[in-house]
């Protein structure tokens, strides 16, 4: 019988669709990358999700985040993403967590219940903690490296963290993961050299912050404000979603 996933099933088969439907994926960070991960995965038939983010939609998110519209500004990102996912598939199980994952609250999450973990957060401390906890639990994880300060979406690659180059965030991650004894980590990274922001615009963002009331990560509190465009983080998110689908459903 035809259903909303029939076109996907034509490509991957019934058994793969059943595996995807029975899988629970945790997405940490529902922003420019994570939002597109969720979008592609729910459209691919993943049956259950945990969404983790404590931030609210900001007007400055409209240039790149799939959850950002004029109507959603000021709303929690996880609330908006959940509503969108249920509109796509009313039967999907979506659990939301309005918090920012850090080593201090890592014990609040039981990673063993996840079939796959997506790291789409920005901070190194959180990324390292996610990788360590995922690998301890024996759950596959994929991490996004830097998607800001980029203009060429064609330069994204999938690789082990220790085979990455150019990306400044990947360099830091290689160093920190090596200290922790982590042997491997699948990542999506870009080999495009970062583009420096126009300094007057970066200063303007800090001094004229328009983040919504109650936002946890205001411009005034950020050390760096990277420039971004719609098509780069979206591409990274779609590549990550493809890796998750292949690993969970197709096994390639």
Outline where the language-model segments fall.
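Glycine-rich phosphate/adenylate-binding loop
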Residues: 2, 109-116, 121, 126, ...
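Conserved SAM/SAH-binding loop
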Residues: 98-106
């Amino acid at each position: 019988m035809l259903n909303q996933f029939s076109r996907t099933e034509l490509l991957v088969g019934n058994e793969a669709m059943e595996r995807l439907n029975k899988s629970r994926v945790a997405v940490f960070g529902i922003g420019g990358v994570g939002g597109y991960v969720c979008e592609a995965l729910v459209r691919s038939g993943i049956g259950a999700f945990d969404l983790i983010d404590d931030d609210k939609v900001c007007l400055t998110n409209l240039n790149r985040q799939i959850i950002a519209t004029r109507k959603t500004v000021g709303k929690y990102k996880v609330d908006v993403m959940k509503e969108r996912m249920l509109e796509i598939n009313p039967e999907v199980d979506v659990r939301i967590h309005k918090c920012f994952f850090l080593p201090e609250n890592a014990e609040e999450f039981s990673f063993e219940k996840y079939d796959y973990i997506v790291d789409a957060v920005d901070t190194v401390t959180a990324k390292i903690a996610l990788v360590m906890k995922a690998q301890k639990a024996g759950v596959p994880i994929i991490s996004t490296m830097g998607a800001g300060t980029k203009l060429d979406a064609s330069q994204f690659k999938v690789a082990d963290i220790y085979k990455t180059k150019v990306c400044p965030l990947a360099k830091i991650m290689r160093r920190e993961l090596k200290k922790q004894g982590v042997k491997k980590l699948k990542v999506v990274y870009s080999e495009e050299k970062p583009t420096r922001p126009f300094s007057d615009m970066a200063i303007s963002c800090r001094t004229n912050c328009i983040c919504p009331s109650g936002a946890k990560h205001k411009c005034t509190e950020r050390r760096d404000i990277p420039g971004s465009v719609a098509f780069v983080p979206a591409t990274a998110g779609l590549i990550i979603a493809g890796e998750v689908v292949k690993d969970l459903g197709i096994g390639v």
